[in-house]
Structure formats: C-alpha cells, structure tokens
C-alpha cells in the first residue's frame, strides 16, 4: 500500500470525496511504542481520519484529532499538516486491564469526547467537541458533522495494525453546476457496500472504479503522506518555561539538568543548568544551544 491521499469528484454533481491509504507512516508511528492490538487499530483509523480532515479543510496549519476518555485508554491523538506529515500517540491507564484485541472505540475509552482542533499558522485556533456516543470513530465523526450543521459527510475507516485506510464523501452546497440532485444519495448508497478488506487491500483507483464505475468520477493526482514529528528544541523550551522558574531550578538541583523526550518520536532533549537560566531570564530569545 502506498502512503497517499487522493481527491475525487463526480462531474455535474455537488459530491466530492477523498481516499487515503497508509502503511509506512502507520508503521513508523507504531514502531516507537508497544501498544496493544486494539489501540494500534484505533490509532490507524485516527491517522486515516485526520489525513482526510486535513485535506478537507485545506488549512495552512495543523489539524489534530483527539479522543479523550476515562477508560483503559485515556488519550488517542493524531495530527496532520498540509505537507503530508502525520504523527499519533496513545496514552493508557497503567492500572487498567489491557483491552481485548477486538475492543470497540467505546470499550477502549469509556466516557469520552472527540476534540477536533484547527490551528492555523496565522489566525485564531478553533476547537470542535463531540461526545463519543457510537462504537466507531467514523460514526462519531459523522455525528460531529451532523451536529455542527456542516456539510453532509460520510466516512469509512479501517485498520488492521499494519495498514490503515479511509474514504470520505461530502455533499457541497448546491449550485448551478449540480445537474444531478440524486447524486448524494446514490453515491452514499454505492459506498455502503464497501468492506474493510476492500478498503485495505485494493488499489485506490481500482476501489473507486469498483464502487463508482457507473458515475462520472474525476480522480486527481495523489498526494504523498509520511510520518513526521513537529517537535523542535524551541517548542520543548517553550513548554518547559511553562513549568515556572522554581520548578525548573528544583529539577536542576535534583538531577543536574532537565532532560525530556518527545512522546511522538522519542527525540531526546537535554537542557543544562546554564540553558535553564537563559530560558528563565530570556524566554523569548530562542532555545539555548543543544548540549
């Protein structure tokens, strides 16, 4: 499976879509952690979903998708940007029993919320929140779109621990170019025949042809996707500054330096006592040089 996302639309209708497949990027996320099988699968669906959402909103910034719960899994989070970089992480309750391999989303997270964050480079951050009231991520996201009175949207997501894939259909606002008022109901009906195995196994163009060969579908050039972490020394320094001078100096006295690790990519960052003093005195001057 090639790590890529493709847009498509149906001529003379107000229906558009996207299809995504992930294998290497998915493996790069999972290789850094020893997650249970059910968590690996849910993270795959989350990665597929955030890639689809990023392509949908076309934001110059980052899109993140979080599931915050009270169950054995406390957090599932995936993030994407317009450059095609993806990353994801899960946090488990250390005292809870490991989830069963085929556990549903609700079985993993218990009472939970889904938080969608749009963080543009320039402009105001936006967050949308919806309660987890369905067993699948796709159904929860469809519920979010329905409740927020946005465009009618349907999603199909699948992951098996090795590969992840997804498809999105969306009904755009009606205009004069739409000469087929029944197109939305018809294309959704065709897509409901899609199985997880087909979504994971078939080439994207083959899959679209199999589903929509009687429609006038126009498929655009694919966009490559990959694992990429946005952590930097400057961002880590900014986060450390939030701990406050007293706490930072206490850590230095106890440990000789402040050391931390990115949860996403496991990059290691070390700040000496001198680095910390520079950070405290001049928080906006940039991160001290790596030692």
From Swiss-Prot:
Under oxidizing conditions two disulfide bonds are formed involving the reactive cysteines. Under reducing conditions zinc is bound to the reactive cysteines and the protein is inactive. InterPro entries: Heat_shock_Hsp33 (IPR000397), Heat_shock_Hsp33_C (IPR016154), Heat_shock_Hsp33_N (IPR016153), Hsp33_helix_hairpin_bin_dom_sf (IPR023212). It holds the Pfam family HSP33. It comes from the Bacteria. SUPFAM superfamilies: Hsp33 domain, HSP33 redox switch-like. CDD domains: Hsp33 (cd00498). Belongs to the HSP33 family. Redox regulated molecular chaperone. Protects both thermally unfolding and oxidatively damaged proteins from irreversible aggregation. Plays an important role in the bacterial defense system toward oxidative stress. This is 33 kDa chaperonin. It comes from Chromohalobacter salexigens (strain ATCC BAA-138 / DSM 3043 / CIP 106854 / NCIMB 13768 / 1H11). The gene is hslO.
């Amino acid at each position: 499976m090639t790590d890529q996302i493709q847009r498509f639309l149906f001529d003379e209708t107000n229906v558009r879509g996207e299809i995504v497949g992930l294998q290497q990027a998915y493996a790069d996320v999972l290789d850094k952690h020893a997650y249970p099988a059910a968590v690996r699968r849910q993270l795959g669906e989350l990665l597929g979903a955030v890639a689809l959402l990023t392509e949908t909103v076309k934001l110059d910034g980052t899109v993140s998708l979080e599931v915050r719960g009270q169950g054995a899994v406390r957090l599932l989070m995936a993030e994407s940007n317009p450059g095609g970089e993806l990353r994801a992480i899960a946090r488990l309750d250390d005292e809870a029993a490991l989830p069963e391999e085929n556990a549903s989303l609700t079985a993993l997270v218990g009472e939970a919320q889904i938080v969608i964050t749009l963080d543009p480079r320039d402009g105001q951050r936006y967050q949308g929140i919806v309660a987890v009231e369905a067993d699948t991520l796709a159904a929860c996201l469809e519920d979010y779109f329905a409740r927020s009175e946005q465009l009618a949207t349907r999603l199909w997501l699948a992951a098996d621990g090795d590969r992840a894939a997804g498809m999105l259909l969306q009904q755009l606002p009606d205009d004069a170019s739409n000469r087929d008022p029944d197109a939305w109901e018809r294309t959704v009906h065709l897509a409901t025949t899609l199985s997880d195995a087909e979504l994971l196994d078939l080439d994207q163009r083959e899959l679209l042809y199999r589903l929509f060969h009687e429609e006038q579908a126009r498929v655009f050039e694919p966009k490559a996707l990959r694992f990429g972490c946005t952590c930097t020394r400057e961002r880590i320094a900014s986060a450390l500054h939030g701990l406050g001078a007293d706490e930072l100096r206490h850590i230095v006295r106890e440990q000789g330096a402040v050391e931390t690790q990115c949860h996403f990519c496991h990059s290691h960052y070390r700040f000496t006592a001198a680095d910390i003093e520079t950070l405290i005195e001049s928080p906006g001057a940039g991160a001290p040089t790596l030692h």
